[in-house]
């Protein structure tokens, strides 16, 4: 269960990171 929670948390962090990088890239491209 603990590992599962960590995996879910990591997934959320990765998603946020990807969204942030995409936003930065989008702004930089535009």
UniProtKB/Swiss-Prot annotation:
This protein's record includes keyword Lipid metabolism: yes
Organism from which the protein derives: Myxococcus xanthus
Domain Biotin carboxylation: 1-30
Domain commentary: Consists of an N-terminal biotin carboxylation/carboxylase (BC) domain that catalyzes the transient carboxylation of the biotin covalently attached to the C-terminal biotinyl-binding/biotin carboxyl carrier (BCC) domain.
SUPFAM superfamilies in the cross-refs: PreATP-grasp domain
Stated name of the protein: Propionyl-CoA carboxylase alpha chain
Alphabetic keyword roster: ATP-binding, Biotin, Fatty acid biosynthesis, Fatty acid metabolism, Ligase, Lipid biosynthesis, Lipid metabolism, Nucleotide-binding
Alphabetical list of InterPro entries matching this protein: BC-like_N (IPR005481), Biotin_carboxylation_dom (IPR011764), PreATP-grasp_dom_sf (IPR016185)
Influence of pH: Optimum pH is 7.0-7.5.
Top EC category: ligase
């Amino acid at each position: 269960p603990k590992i599962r929670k960590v995996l879910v948390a990591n997934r959320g962090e990765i998603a946020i990171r990807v969204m942030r990088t995409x936003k930065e890239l989008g702004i930089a491209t535009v």
